[in-house]
């Protein structure tokens, strides 16, 4: 898949500064100016909270992993965008997960 993506010319002005495989992408937006973009979810890290019923560390983990990925490419984190995808809504669980997002 990565090989196929490398062959696509999008015609966009910005280009990736780093090769594929890094935890975050750095896009050139002007000469000598880039912006780092990263995304990461909690994935399998939800297994323990589901077993213990304690979700208050999930939000911390979301933020920490995204910030860490941006730092790993030498960028300074300035903003985080995340989302919460759930099958069913539970206000208490939602509040626990989001407690440390803000």
Protein language model regions, located:
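Extreme N-terminal cap/leader segments of soluble proteins
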Residues: 1-54, 73
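A glycine-rich phosphate/pyrophosphate-binding beta-strand-loop-alpha-helix module
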Residues: 53-102
């Amino acid at each position: 898949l990565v090989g196929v993506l490398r062959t696509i010319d999008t015609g966009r002005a910005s280009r990736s500064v780093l090769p594929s495989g890094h935890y975050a992408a750095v896009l050139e937006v002007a000469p000598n100016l880039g912006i780092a973009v990263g995304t990461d979810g909690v994935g399998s890290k939800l297994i323990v909270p589901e077993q213990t019923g304690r979700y208050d560390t999930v939000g911390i983990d979301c933020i920490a992993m995204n910030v860490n990925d941006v730092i790993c490419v030498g960028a300074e984190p300035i903003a985080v965008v995340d989302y919460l995808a759930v099958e069913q809504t539970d206000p208490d669980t939602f509040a626990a997960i989001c407690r440390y997002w803000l």
